[in-house]
């Protein structure tokens, strides 16, 4: 039933209960409301698409492991809806990393970066670090392990300038940069 507010205007609400099977089957729902049949307002509700994330590991290049701290990163992109969980481990022991707020991309998926700041000495002695990512809506769960290996050089795809691996919006002095406005350099957040 309609309820009159203090401003003498009436408001009304309606709830449509839908089974999970119908929710997954139908792409959108429409609602019409109004006082006159000729003057109805319509709203359209789209069911959210479910998309698994892509995960890319970011490790410090040789140029960036001379400072006291190193930054390991995990770029998580292309997921929907915005419901992501990230955890870090060092040789199976929980570590405290940072997960930045997700940003919506033009294709209506999301992306974020998680990073872990570690002492460079721990990286150089070969401790294994793992970024674990889960996305409950898609039942996705995966992990990427990172470990320093002396003398190993990263390989770039043919035609990519140095310092641009993996292929993304990079300049040679940045470890990683996206529209998330995050730049990691010399083991610090800038």
From Swiss-Prot:
Positions of glycan attachment: 54, 179
Record-annotated Ig-like C1-type domain positions: 53-145
Record's keyword terms, sorted: Adaptive immunity, Disulfide bond, Glycoprotein, Immunity, Immunoglobulin, Immunoglobulin domain, Secreted
Subcellular compartments: Secreted
Gene Ontology CC annotations of this record: extracellular region; immunoglobulin complex
Domain of life: Eukaryota
One biological process term in Gene Ontology: adaptive immune response
Tissues/organs with expression: Expressed in pancreas, spleen, epigonal organ and at low levels in several other tissues.
Nucleotide-binding among keywords: no
Disulfide bonds: 74-131
InterPro entries: Ig-like_dom, Ig-like_dom_sf, Ig-like_fold, Ig/MHC_CS, Ig_C1-set, Immune_Resp_Modulators
Entries under PROSITE patterns matching the protein: IG_LIKE, IG_MHC
Chief localization: secreted
Gene3D superfamilies for the chain: Immunoglobulins
Keyword Secreted among UniProt keywords: yes
Protein name: Pancreatic IgW, short secretory form
Lineage: Eukaryota, Metazoa, Chordata, Craniata, Vertebrata
């Amino acid at each position: 039933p309609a309820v009159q507010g203090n401003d003498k205007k009436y408001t009304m609400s309606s709830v449509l209960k839908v089974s999970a099977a119908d929710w997954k089957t139908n792409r959108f729902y429409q609602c019409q409301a109004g006082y006159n049949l000729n003057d109805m307002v319509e709203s359209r509700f789209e069911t959210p698409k479910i998309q698994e994330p892509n995960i890319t590991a970011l490790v410090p290049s040789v140029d960036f492991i001379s400072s006291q701290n190193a930054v390991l990163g995990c770029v998580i992109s292309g997921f929907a809806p915005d419901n992501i969980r990230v955890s870090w481990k060092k040789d199976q022991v929980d570590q405290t990393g940072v997960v930045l707020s997700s940003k919506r991309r033009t294709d209506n998926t999301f992306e974020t970066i998680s990073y872990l700041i570690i002492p460079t000495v721990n990286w150089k002695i070969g401790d294994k670090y793992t970024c674990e990512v889960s996305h409950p809506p898609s039942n996705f769960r995966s992990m990427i392990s990172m470990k320093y290996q002396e003398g190993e050089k990263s390989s770039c795809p043919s035609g990519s300038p140095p310092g641009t691996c993996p292929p993304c919006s990079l300049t040679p002095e940045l470890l990683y940069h996206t529209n998330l406005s995050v730049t990691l350099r010399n083991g610090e957040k800038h």
